[in-house]
């Protein structure tokens, strides 16, 4: 039963991470301090009185995705056939970055879980068409990871 609670908590942390990272598409953070400000200003965090120093799973996802964005975009571009990241919708791109980050940089998140959670985020924030697009890219990345043509960073 505890595992289910943890999964629910992680899912809500992913949603928070998505919202903060999505917002950065419109008001980019230039450094880690601005990234922390964006996190602490998000409604889910500020409604709880904010956090002096960001901690927890959501923050780890935000910081890791933001820090590794260039490498994540290279992976996404590789598997998004005939799509440049500039052409991918902001919602879809944010979800892809988060899920690919989890696949490659988080030893505690199996690729199948990263794919499933990416699809869940697309159900919550995207539209029906984006799910297939996201699933296709994430599945291709997972297969490349399994085949060893891309490697984990942890």
UniProtKB/Swiss-Prot annotation:
Keyword entries, A-Z: RNA-binding, Transcription, Transcription antitermination, Transcription regulation
GO cellular component, one term: cytosol
A family per Pfam: NusB
GO MF terms, alphabetically ordered: RNA binding
Family matches, as InterPro entries: NusB-like_sf, NusB_fam, NusB_RsmB_TIM44
Family note: Belongs to the NusB family.
Protein name: Transcription antitermination protein NusB
Organism annotation: Oleidesulfovibrio alaskensis (strain ATCC BAA-1058 / DSM 17464 / G20) (Desulfovibrio alaskensis)
Lineage: Bacteria, Pseudomonadati, Thermodesulfobacteriota, Desulfovibrionia, Desulfovibrionales
């Amino acid at each position: 039963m505890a595992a289910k609670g943890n999964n629910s908590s992680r899912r809500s942390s992913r949603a928070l991470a998505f919202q903060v990272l999505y917002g950065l598409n419109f008001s980019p953070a230039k450094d880690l301090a601005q990234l922390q400000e964006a996190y602490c200003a998000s409604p889910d965090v500020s409604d709880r009185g904010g956090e002096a120093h960001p901690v927890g799973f959501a923050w780890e996802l935000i910081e890791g995705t933001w820090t590794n964005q260039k490498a994540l975009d290279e992976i996404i571009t590789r598997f998004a056939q005939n799509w440049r990241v500039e052409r991918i919708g902001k919602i879809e791109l944010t979800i892809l970055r988060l899920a690919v980050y989890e696949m490659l940089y988080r030893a505690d998140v199996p690729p199948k879980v990263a794919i499933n959670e990416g699809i869940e985020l697309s159900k919550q924030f995207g539209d029906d068409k984006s799910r297939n697009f996201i699933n296709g890219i994430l599945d291709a990345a997972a297969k490349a990871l399994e085949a060893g043509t891309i490697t984990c960073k942890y």
